[in-house]
Regions:
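Structural marker of alpha-solenoid helical repeat scaffolds
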Residues: 18-19, 52, 86-87, 121, ...
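Canonical tetratricopeptide repeat
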Residues: 28, 62, 96, 131-132, ...
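Residue-level recognition of tetratricopeptide repeat
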Residues: 31, 65, 99-100, 139
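Register position in tetratricopeptide repeats
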Residues: 35, 69-70, 103-104, 139-143
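Terminal, low-structured helical/coil segments at or just beyond the last alpha-helical repeat
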Residues: 106-147
Length: 147
């Protein structure tokens, strides 16, 4: 998978040599590596993208995902909170924040708060996405059964 990502990234990496601080280009390269589950490589490019453009919420949200997949939930949450400081309505950041709080931090209340904020601030969210978020909220509210 890494070899495939490296091959697809070659033309973008060539462009990057002449424009090393191009946040969009760095983000594209990060997406190639993320798609092939090369999260460490992807995180490096997403980090460079947000270094070049700190307000690049999409790159910051993708960086957070990669950090989470590498086991750094705290780093992921920090990146998502930074994203939300630039764009408090960003649905992807709010959704991911809820998932990470629930899955990595066992914080259903924090997850529900993030998802409720997502629904409140994004009234035009597609119905299927609203339904999916509402389902997650309902599941997070259910008490865990002890084994």
């Amino acid at each position: 998978m890494k070899r495939m990502a490296d091959k697809k990234a070659e033309p973008l990496l060539a462009k990057l040599k002449t424009d090393p601080n191009n946040s969009q280009l760095l983000n594209q390269i990060g997406m190639l590596y993320k798609a092939t589950h090369q999260f460490k490589d992807a995180a490096g490019y997403f980090q460079k993208a947000v270094d070049a453009d700190p307000k690049n919420v999409a790159a910051r949200t993708d960086l957070a995902s990669c950090l989470f997949y590498q086991g750094d939930a705290d780093g992921a949450i920090q990146q998502l909170q930074q994203s939300l400081s630039y764009d408090p309505k960003d649905a992807n950041s709010l959704f991911n924040l809820g998932m990470i709080r629930l899955q990595a931090k066992n914080d259903p209340h924090g997850a529900i708060a993030a998802w409720q904020q997502l629904l409140k601030l994004n009234p035009k969210l597609a119905d299927d996405k609203k339904a999916a978020v509402q389902k997650l909220i309902a599941q997070a509210r259910k008490p865990k059964v002890s084994e």
